[in-house]
Structures are given as C-alpha cells and as structure tokens.
C-alpha cells in the first residue's frame, strides 16, 4: 500500500468515526441529553447564529445556553454529508411544537467540533407563481 492509499484509508476511518459522533450528537440532542450532546465540542468551540448575530464561545457556555431554553426541543435529521474537517447536517428542529428547517455546518479540528454555524428557516407557503 502506497502513502496515498494509506492516507485515504485513514481518512475513511476518520470520516466513519466523525459520522458516528454526529449520529450520537443528534440522538442526544433529540433526547435533550445535554451532557452527551456536547461531548462533540472542543473546550474552546464557537457556535454562531448569523441570523441573530449571536456568537457563543466555549463548550460549557454552549451547553448552558442550550440547557437554559425553557422548552424541550426535538430533532429530526434529514441528511448528514461531509468528509474530513467539514460536515453539514440538515434537520427539522421542533421547539414548542413549531418546526424550523435548520442547517448546521460543523468544522472539526481533530475529532471535535471547533466551530459550528447554524441557520434556521420557518416553513412557508410557496407563492402561486411557482406552482406549475
């Protein structure tokens, strides 16, 4: 096996490990298991919500911010794609029973998330001009 093949094999194993960690993260998120949900983050991770301008620094602060939300959340993962250090999850977040279509972009450093950016969109009725 040459150097390139070894590198690709290692990359494939790492991708499988990250995917398993993501599956565990989203399952814990859906169960409102805040301890397990936040194991995926580096201690100095950054979480950004560009739509509101919020930026939370540090795994403990991210966990505390999410744990302080007054209602339980539900997560329905629709798709996870990625490789290497960049992974994207598309999911439906239900908060107080209202769905929000959400995209999470996670940037990994090693086996932990260093930065996550999330975008949220409420459902809407398609305009008549697009109904063809």
Feature locations, PLM:
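Short, low-complexity N-terminal intrinsically disordered segments enriched in polar/charged residues
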Residues: 1-39, 43, 131-132
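Hydrophobic alpha-helical elements and their junctions with loops/disorder across both membrane
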Residues: 28, 35-36, 52, 96, ...
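A solvent-exposed, acidic/Ser-Thr-rich amphipathic alpha-helical stretch
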Residues: 15, 34-84
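A beta-strand edge to alpha-helix "cap/lid" segment located at domain peripheries
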Residues: 2-13, 63-132
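Alpha-helix C-capping/helix-to-loop hinge sites
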Residues: 25, 47-48, 90
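A structural signal for well-ordered alpha-helical scaffolds and beta->alpha junctions
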Residues: 18, 22, 59-62, 99
């Amino acid at each position: 096996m040459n150097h390139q093949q070894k590198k690709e094999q290692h990359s494939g194993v790492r991708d499988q490990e990250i995917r398993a960690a993501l599956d565990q993260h989203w399952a814990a998120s859906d169960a409102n298991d805040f301890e397990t949900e936040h194991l995926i983050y580096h201690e100095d991770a950054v979480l950004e919500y560009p739509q509101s301008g919020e930026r939370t620094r540090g795994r403990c602060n991210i966990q505390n911010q999410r744990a302080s939300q007054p209602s339980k959340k539900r997560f329905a993962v629709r798709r996870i794609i990625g490789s290497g250090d960049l992974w994207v999850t598309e999911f439906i977040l239900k908060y107080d029973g209202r769905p929000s279509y959400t995209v999470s972009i996670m940037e990994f450093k090693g086996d932990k998330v260093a930065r996550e950016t999330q975008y949220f969109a409420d459902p809407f009725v398609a305009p008549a001009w697009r109904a063809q």
